[in-house]
Amino acid sequence: MLVPSKEEMRAYEVDGYFVRKNFLSEPEVVDFRDHARRQLEDEANSSTVMEKGDKSGKKTLLKLWNHAGDDKFGMLARDERLARMSEALIGEEIYLYSHKMTMKQPREGGAWEWHQDFGYWYNNGCLSPEMLSIWIALDLSNKANGCLQVLKGSHILGRLDHVRENGQTNVDKPYLDAATERFEHVYVDMDPGDALVFHSNLLHRSDANNSDTYRWGYICSYNAVHNAPFTRAREYGNYEELKIVPAGSFMAAG
């Protein structure tokens, strides 16, 4: 199914997120994950992979692409399943805002503090939260290895004030304290191939990876075309036509 079900649409509207089980098939996960491991672990010590630290000193590796090309990463970001899902939920013509890999290595991957994606996309020149992300689990993702956590329904708050702390952009503490009192805190366990689809104003975070397992996730974020940044604040996120490809095309790409 390329578009959300009625239940998924309702969950997105009310809860700000839903999980689509088996979004990628097992062969697709293996193909994409094995390629990613080979390429990105080779790049880990180069300037093309960033390190994002947390307050304890642990670091998560991050690879960000500015454009979606014809390689395996770009082709998955252009896959019709992600594009049609995003278009249906946003309700407007969309384009790919960014795509990135977050890599929490065993015993090393750091935490991400509570934030809203729109908390910093707004500062990049996007006026409205007509944006979402699709987070695809490439490994088993659970509480032990730093799965995503959400405050269920918190997207209804709109954009909250954020502050810069320890190299991260986090929700200002008084607002966070009030939000955690009001909304249910959910740990989102995921199997490889599952996809978490979430609103740009949903409060979310993840803990450090304290396990002996990898916890990698591929994140594609989409924006309404009319909501493209009004200023070129970053190399990524600016409007480019999304050239959608058939489902699974990435498996034939290098």
Located regions from the model:
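Non-heme Fe(II)-dependent double-stranded beta-helix
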Residues: 1-15, 21-114, 119-124, 163, ...
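Short, solvent-exposed loop/turn segments at secondary-structure junctions
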Residues: 25-26, 102-104, 119, 141, ...
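Non-heme Fe(II)/2-oxoglutarate
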Residues: 42, 46-55, 195-197, 201-254
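Short, conserved beta-strand element in jelly-roll/cupin
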Residues: 89, 115, 122-143, 189-192, ...
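Short glycine/proline-enriched turns and hinge-like loops at secondary-structure junctions
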Residues: 113, 125-126, 209-214
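Glycine-rich, charged/polar anion/phosphate-binding loops
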Residues: 118-121, 135-136, 182-184, 202-205
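Double-stranded beta-helix
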Residues: 141-203
